[in-house]
Structures are given as structure tokens and as C-alpha cells.
From Swiss-Prot:
It comes from Tolumonas auensis (strain DSM 9187 / NBRC 110442 / TA 4). Gene3D superfamilies: Jelly Rolls, pectin degrading enzyme 5-keto 4- deoxyuronate isomerase, domain 1. Binds 1 zinc ion per subunit. Belongs to the KduI family. Pathway: Glycan metabolism; pectin degradation; 2-dehydro-3-deoxy-D-gluconate from pectin: step 4/5. Catalyzes the isomerization of 5-dehydro-4-deoxy-D-glucuronate to 3-deoxy-D-glycero-2,5-hexodiulosonate. The gene is kduI. GO terms for molecular function: 4-deoxy-L-threo-5-hexosulose-uronate ketol-isomerase activity; zinc ion binding. It catalyses: 5-dehydro-4-deoxy-D-glucuronate = 3-deoxy-D-glycero-2,5-hexodiulosonate. Zn(2+) binds at residues 196, 198, 203, 245. This is 4-deoxy-L-threo-5-hexosulose-uronate ketol-isomerase. Its cofactor is Zn(2+).
Amino acid sequence: MQVRHNIHPDHAKQFDTAGLRKEFLIENLFIANDITLTYSHIDRIIVGGVMPVEQTVVLSPELGKQVGVAYLLERRELGLINVGGAGVVTVSGQAYEIGNQEALYIGMGNQEVSFASTDAAHPAKFYLNCAPAHTTYPTRKVTQAEARPVTLGDNATGNRRTINKYLVPDVLPTCQLVMGLTRLEEGNMWNSMPCHTHERRMEVYFYFDMTENDTVFHFMGEPQETRHLLVHNEQAVLSPSWSIHCGVGTRRYTFIWGMVGENQVFDDMDHIAIRDIR
């Protein structure tokens, strides 16, 4: 499990490209028949990926030891969205079939969790966020049809997109974790512009649905001290509460957003006027 520390904005603005990428970019999320996890001290979120191919991948007790407990979900909840082929997640003996762009919420206290692919030729890719929890809520699958969609933006400004809210209070209860998926329409390249920050939550963006020759210029930093990261397919960016988070791609793409922090109010954000960005 990699560890990333919280960075003060006065420190972050001193980084060169390599320094920014080291602290905020997560590059290699999916490894065949393995689980990759990155622990961030920003609200103590864990970001990871699981790609079972011909083997079943299990959340081992060793992962719990790395966060000071007997098993990973002893004091944590977990949300995942599948961005690959069909798969099965088994939680405490109950199997959940999770198709492409379907989600699963796993409540605190589940000790036995395993991941498998339905077809090794088209393996599942489970992208996950895991956050501290204070109580147990029921484990539940969320399909695309059950998510709460909101379409925003305009073709003229290149930001026509549909925000699909999977793990939000309107769909199911969680302790603090909120997750969803935003899909840009063809010919649109901007996300979250005009941009915002949210003082009471951190956020992680996971970009996917891109060709190997495409990229997203992800903008970050304080509104008057912006920087950028070049992000490629199936890579994630940690966004502290003080940082803007928006991007423009060489063509359309999809991204998963996950938030943890003070509240679960999706619209609790501090909007930044485009003319005020530096």
C-alpha cells in the first residue's frame, strides 16, 4: 500500500512537474490478479483498483494490519465501480454480479471480500474508494438505472455531460463516502468548468474510457495558483479541499469522482468565476 501525505498549498505551489505527479497522481491502478491501494492522509481515503483475471483476488488480513486493525473494513466502508468486463464481488458469503459501470457499496464490518471476473478474456476492473466509517450500513449493488443522473453544460462551451450519482444519500446511506460517474458527450472535452473547490470535502478523480493516445489536462491548485497534470487512461488524481479540480481532454472521456469529508451535500461547493482563475 502506497502512502501519500497531506500537502499544504504553500508547499504544493513550489513543486515542479515531477513533484506534483509524485504527490497527487496515481498512475498504475490495475495489475492482473492483484489489488493496488494508495492511502492518502487527506481525509484518510484509500484509492485502489482490483483486476482479477483467471484468479480470485481477496482482501487479505494483511491490508488491515497496514491501517492498524484486524481487517481492512473493520472501521471502514468501501465503494467500487466496475470499469471493465463483468465480474463478481463476494461479501461475507453473498455474491454480487457487477457489470460494467455498475457500483457496489460494502458496509463497515465485512471481513471476507473477494473479487472475480466472469470471463478472463474480458476481466473486470473494480475501481474503489475506501473511507473511515462510524457505523454499519447494508451492502448494496447500484445499477446505472438506479443512479441519479443530472445533465449539465452545453455543446457550445464544450462541457455537455451527464453526472450519474451512484453512492449518494438519495440512493443509499453511507457514513461519508460519496461516489459517481460523469460521462462527457461526443465532441465535449471540458469537465467541471466553471470550476470550484469544496472546503469541507476532498475529492478523487479517476479518468478512463480514453484511448492510449489521448490525455486529459487536469487543472489543480489554489484558484490563483493553478497547476496542471497530464493524466492518461485509468489514472487518478488526489484533490485536496483547497484545490480546484477540472480538466480538458484531447477528446471526450469519462471519469469517476469520489468524495469524503465533513458532509455529503453534493452542492456544497465554492464556485470560482473563470475570470478569477490564475
